[in-house]
């Protein structure tokens, strides 16, 4: 029996959801699992390597790298959140997930996602202080301040996402139990509820605007100030050097915000977009940043690059 027929025949309230993986490509799941597995093999060891190098290399105990360690922790968390259901579906066809497990996964995925947005904003502030106020860099970004920034970021993410599982749990799910994805997302679960989801939709939009919306605008504002300062530097070599310190962060910002904003726009306004596009965008927004961030920072950061090269060559 296929997922579609199972979903159509389900007229009673189900205690579980069924994750479909990539709809329409079920026969190719075993082959799709190969690049997905490779991505996890890059993401998890890659972020663990970043954390280990920053912890053991005393020269990296600076604000920029402390924020990078936060980013690596979040990327590690995102990878581990999706790993069980993704590999379960593509390897052994384990598609069932209980409502409570789905809501828990949903909470952690969204919490880590919005926490990553906060840390990327913090890293933009770090670059702003380093370039625009270099003489006050150490006095402004002390370890205490960095710790408080991390706690505030965590508190904001948890506070905003905590209501979502309870808002979803109060609804009946009496139609098809099939979630057209490989993991649980708020927008996907809402589609299965047999109730008016207007309040959930409004709250979801509020969360996105108050996190990703505000953070992305503040990052743009930070880089506008950075660019103004850089253009006022007389030496061309110094201008290039200053901008070069921002390249890794700009790559991380683009890797995170581009698919996330695209996915949010498609979910809310692109009703005619093929569902496969939504699924692919969902994979990009959750899997690409954890895979690419360690690579980008390893390539662009000499201390990290040297340690990684030394570990593999000796």
UniProtKB/Swiss-Prot annotation:
Q: Which SUPFAM superfamilies match?
A: Family A G protein-coupled receptor-like
Alphabetically, the GO molecular function entries are: G protein-coupled receptor activity; olfactory receptor activity
On the Extracellular side, which residues? 1-30, 81-104, 166-201, 264-278
Whether Nucleotide-binding counts among this entry's keywords is no
Disulfide bonding pattern of the chain: 102-194
Task: Please name the Pfam families in this protein's record.
Answer: 7tm_4
Give the Cytoplasmic membrane side ranges.
Answer: 52-59, 126-144, 223-242, 300-314
Q: Name one GO cellular component term.
A: plasma membrane
Query: What superkingdom heads the lineage?
Result: Eukaryota
Report whether Glycoprotein shows up as a keyword of the record.
yes
Recorded topology in the membrane: Multi-pass membrane protein
Glycosylation sites recorded in the entry for this protein: 8
Gene3D superfamilies, alphabetically? Rhodopsin 7-helix transmembrane proteins
PROSITE patterns reported in the protein's UniProt record = G_PROTEIN_RECEP_F1_1 (PS00237), G_PROTEIN_RECEP_F1_2 (PS50262)
- Sorted UniProt keywords: Cell membrane, Disulfide bond, G-protein coupled receptor, Glycoprotein, Membrane, Olfaction, Receptor, Sensory transduction, Transducer, Transmembrane, Transmembrane helix
Annotated compartments: Cell membrane
The record's annotation in InterPro entries points to: GPCR_Rhodpsn, GPCR_Rhodpsn_7TM, Olfact_rcpt, OR51/52/56-like
Where primarily located? membrane
State the PANTHER family in the record.
OLFACTORY RECEPTOR 51G2 (PTHR26450:SF133), OLFACTORY RECEPTOR 56B1-RELATED (PTHR26450)
Q: What does this protein do?
A: Odorant receptor.
Similarity section: Belongs to the G-protein coupled receptor 1 family.
Protein name stated in the entry: Olfactory receptor 51G2
Question: What is the native source organism of this protein?
Answer: Homo sapiens (Human)
What gene does this protein come from? OR51G2
């Amino acid at each position: 029996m296929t997922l579609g027929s199972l979903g159509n025949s389900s007229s009673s309230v189900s205690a579980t959801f069924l994750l479909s993986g990539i709809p329409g490509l079920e026969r190719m799941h075993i082959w799709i699992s190969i690049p997905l597995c490779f991505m996890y093999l890059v993401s998890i060891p890659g972020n663990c390597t970043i954390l280990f190098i920053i912890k053991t290399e005393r020269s990296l105990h600076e604000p920029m790298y402390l924020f990078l360690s936060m980013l690596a922790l979040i990327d590690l968390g995102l990878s581990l959140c999706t790993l069980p259901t993704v590999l379960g579906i593509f390897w052994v066809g384990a598609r069932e997930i209980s409502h409570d497990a789905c809501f828990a996964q949903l909470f952690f995925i969204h919490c880590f996602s919005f926490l990553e947005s906060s840390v990327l904003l913090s890293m933009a502030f770090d670059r702003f202080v380093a370039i625009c106020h270099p003489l006050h860099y150490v006095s402004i970004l002390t370890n205490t301040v960095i710790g408080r920034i991390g706690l505030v970021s965590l508190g904001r993410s948890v506070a905003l996402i905590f209501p979502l599982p309870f808002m979803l749990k109060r609804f009946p799910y009496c139609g098809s139990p099939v979630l057209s994805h490989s993991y649980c997302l708020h927008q996907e679960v809402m589609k299965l509820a047999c109730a008016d989801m207007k309040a959930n939709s409004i709250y979801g939009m509020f969360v996105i605007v108050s996190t990703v919306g505000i953070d992305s605008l503040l990052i743009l504002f930070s880089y506008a100030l950075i660019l103004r300062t850089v253009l006022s530097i007389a030496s061309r070599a110094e201008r290039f050097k200053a901008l070069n310190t921002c390249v890794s962060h700009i790559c991380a910002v683009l890797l995170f915000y581009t698919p996330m904003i695209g996915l949010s726009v498609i979910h809310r306004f692109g009703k005619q977009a093929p569902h496969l596009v939504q699924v692919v965008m969902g994979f990009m927004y959750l899997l690409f940043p954890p895979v690419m961030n360690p690579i980008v920072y390893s390539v662009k950061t000499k201390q990290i690059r040297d340690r990684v090269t030394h570990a593999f060559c000796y």
